[in-house]
Amino acid sequence: MSIFDWFAKQEKSEPPIQQQQKEREIADGLWTKCVACTALTYTKDLQANQLVCTECGHHFRVESSERIAQLMDKNTWKPLNDHLTPTDPLKFCDRKPYSDRIKDTQEKTGLVDAVQTGTGLIDGLPLALGVMDFRFMGGSMGSVVGEKLCRLIEYATQERLPVVIVCASGGARMQEGMLSLMQMAKISGALERHRNAKLLYIPVLTHPTTGGVTASFAMLGDLIIAEPNATIGFAGRRVIEQTLREKLPDGFQTSEYLLKHGFVDAIVSRTQLKKTLAQLISIHQPFFPVLPPLNVREKHHHHHSEEVVLKMDGKEE
């Protein structure tokens, strides 16, 4: 065997170091490989960094329970309406019955539906929070998701709380037909009443936020925050290109593209999200306990003016 044949054999039997790293088996979840930069990170370090890659800043998807733990102060979370569960009014069946799909997804994820709602404290400030979970049928918005979010917003309006909804969804749930689509208007109506009460609403757009969620409550915030490099849009890129027969620009439907064109107000890293939300709420919140309703202020001003006139009349006498 010549030296050239020997080297050729070694190249076939032993892949390069980079290839070995890519194909390395990650045993028992001890290490996690970044899907963006392929760097291997100790899983506990990744979790301590809120599932943000320490090498490239890639944001991994986060389960709703973990997101709640990241945002809410410890032992302050109180779930709302967690007893609501989806039904199958249309007896819908695609590859399998919708009722079976619900049960299978509930067993797999441990969730009742694609959103968790509740109240708690964020850096000591009261907050009504909704967190969508993409693991549950792609975070799709059905009747239960719409009802839970609507009740959350109505409760926040009644109790004068700011609302934050963390969005992660493929859109409306097709298995529920019109019952799913009507949730867009239903939630939007609840948010309008919340806005009329001069209360703060902030949606946080994560990867991905698409479809009917984008077309409704995801874009109705007083301030709209997005995570870095999140896919945000209505229809998919391929669908738009095939419909328009045009090539879309690079980076289209990313949070950076939307920020550049004025559709979102800020891109905030997950590691800074709690701090940022708390600061925004603290800026907005003090105006409500300090300032009474407008009609009360007007009465107070009128009464104060009368007192001044009486005192001036007394001095003149």
From Swiss-Prot:
SUPFAM superfamilies: ClpP/crotonase (SSF52096)
EC number: 2.1.3.15
GO biological process, one term: fatty acid biosynthetic process
InterPro entries on file: AcCoA_carboxyl_beta, Acetyl_CoA_COase_Trfase_b_su, ClpP/crotonase-like_dom_sf, COA_CT_N, Znf-ACC
Domain of life, source organism: Bacteria
Required cofactor names: Zn(2+)
Class in the EC hierarchy, top level: transferase
Function per UniProt: Component of the acetyl coenzyme A carboxylase (ACC) complex. Biotin carboxylase (BC) catalyzes the carboxylation of biotin on its carrier protein (BCCP) and then the CO(2) group is transferred by the transcarboxylase to acetyl-CoA to form malonyl-CoA.
Family according to the record: Belongs to the AccD/PCCB family.
Name of the protein in its database record: Acetyl-coenzyme A carboxylase carboxyl transferase subunit beta
Taxonomic source organism: Crocosphaera subtropica (strain ATCC 51142 / BH68)
Classification of source organism: Bacteria, Bacillati, Cyanobacteriota, Cyanophyceae, Oscillatoriophycideae
